[in-house]
Amino acid sequence: MTFGMNRRRFLQVTAGGVVTATTIGGGLGSARAQDRPFIWISPRGTLEVLDDYPYWVAQRFGYFGDLQTEMQAGPSDGTATVKFVDQGQADMGFPSPGVFSFALENDLDLVSVWNMGAVDVFDFAFRPGEGMTDLKGLEGKTVLLGSAAWQAICDPILHAVGVDVTKVNYVEAGWPAWGTLLARGEGDAALSWEGLRADWQGKGLQFDYWLGLESSPFPANSFVVRRSDVEDPERHKLIEDYLRAWAMGMEFGHLNPAAATQIVFEQFPIVKSSLGPRFGTESMMQLANVFRGKWEEREGWGWHDPARWTAFFEATAALGQTSKQIDVASVINNDFIGPANEFDRDRVAADAASFELSDDMAEVDLEVIRAQFYANAVNVQG
């Protein structure tokens, strides 16, 4: 897929009339450190998910301090998370690597400052007994997607593991039915992701999974900001402080997954009613596992692995998803990682240890979840 729109056209078309260069001019990019709340915008069109638990934990325990913050769901169009940041409607977006590369292709001057997804979050689901350890088996097969746009997620992953993507048939089966259709016998595989893996299991959809976190060489979603904010000393410091609160929330979730899950449940009761304590906690733990990544190889929460990003941009170039050479060092910034990881770990540990779980959350057996964590994964040993 090649993106030929110029920057102006990209902003006008994808904003759906909500954000355009002509209507907001220079946006709010010149706003000083805290003359308005620091706005984070979701790529999903909803905040009613477990994915953002570090924010809700940080808000609950005051880790943001005096910072004014705001979370916005944004439109369901996944590219809005980069458009809104570029145009000053938000301060930080959370794009997938594919959407970030799309923004760079269209000359949006953004920088990734925090790699939430240290390893690849995306999986491929198969009916029980049909799972593949070698995805070359998908050549000539049909992969079900919730949205046709997800082909841009699948192609780089498949290309990286040696699949001829021109031989894979994609079918837009629709959200949220694509997993159900796979279970009913349609197609041969479906795109999934960590967190959703537990969600589907909780809904009775039993699959075998090829896990990206085990076999994909790519990273997952990251936080991006305007380059001008990185270069502005006041905004730079504000971003450091903001990310430190996220790091504390991530540390809390690592120490007490059930508590982090309960905090999201209390913020959004619909999430609890949808998942329940057991599978809600497992879903959160799957996400936390992606956020932590291969910890011994990382330099703290949020650290980008340059090799993973280089591999991703090389794959998108080979597939024609990007037409220009992307300089990884210019768009991936690890300068915030050290300062953001300098926090009071004793305070976070005490908060995690003293959190009072509700009766139903206290009944969730984390050791059982851990023992069965990869039971339905075909490409994870042990």
State the predicted function of each range:
Residues Q34-E194, W210-P217, D360, V364-N379:
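Short, glycine-/small- and polar/acidic-enriched structural segments
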Residues T2-F3, R9-S30:
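N-terminal export signals
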Residues M116-F126, G202-D232, I239, L243:
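Periplasmic-binding protein-like
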Residues G62, L67-Q68, Q89, F94, ...:
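Sec/Tat-exported extracytoplasmic proteins
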Residues T310-G382:
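Conserved C-terminal helix/tail region of periplasmic/extracytoplasmic solute-binding proteins
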Residues P233-I326:
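Secondary-structure end/capping motifs
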